[in-house]
């Protein structure tokens, strides 16, 4: 298994952050790692979406867990490995909200692909979380 986590605190209210997360079609507005996105349903477990990174191939993903106002998990199943990212809101220091992105790569090929693919997937997490926080704090 390969794993990585990044978090940041913000003064933005959890419901404001959640509003931006739960509007998948708007993700490219604040996430520079997404050139285009197509959603096949509501923001709920089981909904699939196709995310296209800049200069990249479209990736088919699925929401596997949604706890309104708290967390959602998306997953890309590549057969011999699965990339799973949990996006979570937690109480922070002095009334702040902590935004957490955690990615795990699991499955039979995880030890082979994780060390190369994982850092490529998660390299922009600090920038993505910072952009979300800036948007939510407006």
Walk through the language-model features, giving the residues of each.
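A short, polar/proline- and glycine-enriched secondary-structure boundary/capping micro-motif
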Residues: 61-62, 83-86, 109-115
């Amino acid at each position: 298994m390969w794993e990585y986590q990044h978090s940041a605190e913000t003064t933005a209210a959890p419901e404001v952050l959640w509003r931006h997360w739960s509007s998948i079609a708007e993700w490219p507005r604040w996430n520079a790692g997404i050139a285009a996105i197509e959603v096949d349903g509501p923001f709920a477990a089981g909904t699939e979406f196709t995310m296209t990174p800049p200069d990249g191939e479209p990736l088919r993903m699925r929401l596997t867990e949604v706890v309104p106002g708290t967390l959602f998990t998306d997953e890309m199943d590549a057969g011999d490995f699965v990339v799973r990212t949990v996006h979570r809101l937690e109480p922070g220091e002095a009334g702040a909200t902590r935004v957490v992105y955690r990615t795990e790569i699991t499955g039979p090929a995880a030890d082979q692909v994780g060390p190369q693919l994982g850092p490529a997937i998660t390299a922009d997490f600090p920038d993505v979380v910072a952009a979300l926080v800036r948007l939510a704090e407006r």
